[in-house]
Amino acid sequence: MKRHTHAFFIMIAVVLLGSCDGVSDSGGASVHEPLVLPDVHDPAQLVRVGDALRLYASPVEWWAYSLDDRDWYFLGDDLYDGNNPDWDLGDAAYWAPSIVQVAEDRYRLYHSAVYDEANHGSRIGFARGVVADGEIAWAPVDDYVVESDGYDQPFAIDPAVFPDDEGRHWLVYGSHATGIWIVEIDPDSGFLAERPWDKRWRPDDDRFTHLADYGGNRHDENNIEAAYIYNHPENEFYYLFVNWDRCCSGTDSTYNIRIGRSDSPTGPYLDRDGRALSYGGGSLFLDRSGEILGDSRFVGPGHAGIYRHVDGDDYFSHHFYDAASGGTPSLALWNLAWVDGWPRIDRGRPVEFE
């Protein structure tokens, strides 16, 4: 398997950064850059396997960040090694994976398989992974979880799976159309917890709960997607991150990250001003042009993820379009602080793992 390395370096600028929604106040200290990895789009949250962090992204490519070498290594770009499952209908595009640990050395990697983007034809399924010799070996599963085939239902893309405080698993997904939805997943099988054979959303189906809609004024349609929920282990809140507006146009992208929180995985999620995300609320976490970060390099941030290290520190990941390299889609990984129960990027500390 071909292997690539991406050397990175940490740049330090001595500037003052004021406190704002998405960035914590550095108190006049040095401001640090994130870890950056180029050629990454739609990243899943990072997970640790052995002595490396694992990153999965569209179109299901993956990398390792060695905690010893402090370097990135490209590992692969063919999830099923040519043996794609039949449920992807033959030539579907794999997008926006989400990884969840289900037991010691066992994982599931959820992803969408888009076969008719123009008509929102897509399915969400998963691969089963087992850790052997420090690597995750993935195997296809012969069935899928949910599907969509029209604009009158949640578009079955951008899955994100997480456990709640009671050990139940949840799938949050959706893009444009009817917005962001959540449905319970059986933690043992990986499929829908109720009626797993019935894979399509309907307006009267109480298995599915609506979480968020677009609240911006840039577009007439429901421009929201890339939902991610973080179950904070030390407070009572679940944090819902979503993207508003549009991706995939380099430095012309208008993606921005919004946030709300709830004491229940199924909501309602409220922003800092008490507005429900289900009615278009959403506090701005990262803006489209890097103003909150204090650096215009970071255009169109999207696909939030949070990794908790063994020392209890949290790190926030997202993709962006790098204005310093012609709009190349790239990963950024930052320190994350929690201030008054809300997350903020912490640029006062370098991204280092102890």
Could you say what each language-model-derived stretch is?
Residues 1-8:
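Bacterial N-terminal signal peptides that target proteins for export
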Residues 8-18:
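Bacterial N-terminal signal peptides
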Residues 20-354:
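Carbohydrate-active catalytic/glycan-binding domains of CAZyme proteins
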